[in-house]
Amino acid sequence: MSFDLIIKNGTVILENEARVVDIAVKGGKIAAIGQDLGDAKEVMDASGLVVSPGMVDAHTHISEPGRSHWEGYETGTRAAAKGGITTMIEMPLNQLPATVDRASIELKFDAAKGKLTIDAAQLGGLVSYNIDRLHELDEVGVVGFKCFVATCGDRGIDNDFRDVNDWQFFKGAQKLGELGQPVLVHCENALICDALGEEAKREGRVTAHDYVASRPVFTEVEAIRRVLYLAKVAGCRLHVCHISSPEGVEEVTRARQEGQDVTCESCPHYFVLDTDQFEEIGTLAKCSPPIRDLENQKGMWEKLFNGEIDCLVSDHSPCPPEMKAGNIMEAWGGIAGLQNCMDVMFDEAVQKRGMSLPMFGKLMATNAADIFGLQQKGRIALGKDADFVFIQPNSSYVLTNDDLEYRHKVSPYVGRTIGARITKTILRGDVIYDIEQGFPVAPKGQFILKHQQ
C-alpha cells in the first residue's frame, strides 16, 4: 500500500510505551505503525524528536462572538496549533451571548467558519436561566455542560453567563444525568470568596498574596464536597475543573474510591508558578482558583504523579490589556496560556521530574479525549485521526511577546526559559504549524459533535 505520509525515526508516544517506530497516514487517519512500512507521497524524518498525540485541551475560552476583542477563533486556534494542540473543547463563556441554547451555539458555529486552525468540540452552559433548554444543546452535539458555583458573569449584560445556586445545580444535574451528559463545575464557595474579597478591598489589601488569601483552599474543598454529593444524588457524571489544591484532589479521589463517576483536571500554572511569582508577574497571573504557595504546588505535583489528576488543560481565558490594569483585586482574572501548555509541561514534568512519556501523553491528550467521548482523538493508534505534535527535547528558548499568536500578545510565561520546543503540529495528516514555515495551510479545523462520534 502507498500512504500519504510516513513519519520515520521519532520516539513515538503510544498508549502504554514510547519507542522509536514509524507511523503511516492515509486519508487523515493512522493507517500503520511499525517498521519498513513501504512508500508514501511524503516522508518526514523525526529523528531526535518525540512524537506525541496532539494535545486535547479540554478547557479553553475563545470569546467569539461578542467579545472577539478579547480573543477569537483565528488567533486563538493559531496559538493552539503553535503550542501542539490539535483539539480544543471550548467553554460556553466568555462569548456573548453565552452558549446556553440552540440559537447561541449556532452563532458560535457561524462565527468560526473558515477560522479554525485546529478541531474543536463545544460545551454547553448550565446557568440559572436555561434549565428547561438543556436538551437543545444536547441535540446539537455538545460534549458536556459547564457551570459555576462561584460567582460569575456581568450582571449588567442580560445574555452573559450566570452561576447557579445549589437548587439550580441539582435540578440541572438531574436533567444532564438523564441525557447522559457530564457536568463540569468551577468549584469555589461563592458567598465566602465574595465576602473575603470585598473585605480585603475595603481594607486596602490588594496584593497578590491578599488575593490568594481571599480565595483560600477550604473554599475550593467545600465546593468540591458539595457538588460531589449533589451530583451523586442527582445521578450525573461530574468533572471538576481546574483543581488548584491537593486537598481538592483528595476529595475527588475519595469519591472515586467509593464508586462515584467523577474526573478532574488541573492547569500548568498551578504546577510552575507560585504566589511569590504571582506577586512579581502581577495581574497577568491572576486567575481563579488562584495560584497558591510553593508547599501547595509540591502537593499538586505529588497528586499528578500519583495519577489522581486525569488531565491537564490550559484554561486559556485572555482579555484586553486594559482589563488587567490596576491592582490585582480589581483586575480581570484569567490567564493566557494555551500556546505553552505542552512545551512547559514537557520541560517541567518529563525533563525535570522524570515523568514517563506514556503518562505525559495520557495527561495531555488521551484522558481528555476519553472523558469527553472524542473517539477519534487523543492517541496514536490504528484508525485514529492522524493528529501529532513533534517535540524537540532539551532545546531551550526564552518566550517573548512576539512569539505569541494571541490577539493580545501577553502571557505570564513571557520571559520564561522553556527547555523544549514544539517544532511541528499535524492535524488529520496535514501540517498546520511548522517552526520554520509557520502556518503552511489554510484553516482546516472542524467542529466535533457528540452524535457524530
UniProtKB/Swiss-Prot annotation:
Keywords recorded for this protein, A-Z: Hydrolase, Metal-binding, Purine metabolism, Zinc
EC number from the UniProt entry: 3.5.2.5
Cofactor(s) annotated in UniProt: Zn(2+)
One GO cellular component term: cytoplasm
Pathway(s): Nitrogen metabolism; (S)-allantoin degradation; allantoate from (S)-allantoin: step 1/1
Superkingdom assignment: Bacteria
GO BP term, example: purine nucleobase catabolic process
Residue positions, PTM N6-carboxylysine: K146
The UniProt record lists the keyword Protease: no
Cofactor note: Binds 2 Zn(2+) ions per subunit.
Entry binding sites for Zn(2+) 1: H59, H61, K146, D315
UniProt PTM comment: Carboxylation allows a single lysine to coordinate two zinc ions.
Gene Ontology MF annotations: allantoinase activity; cobalt ion binding; zinc ion binding
Keyword field contains Zinc: yes
Catalysis: reaction(s): (S)-allantoin + H2O = allantoate + H(+)
Chain positions recorded as Zn(2+) 2 binding sites: K146, H186, H242
Family: Belongs to the metallo-dependent hydrolases superfamily. Allantoinase family.
Subunit relationships: Homotetramer.
Function: Catalyzes the conversion of allantoin (5-ureidohydantoin) to allantoic acid by hydrolytic cleavage of the five-member hydantoin ring.
Name recorded for this polypeptide: Allantoinase
Organism, as annotated: Escherichia coli O139:H28 (strain E24377A / ETEC)
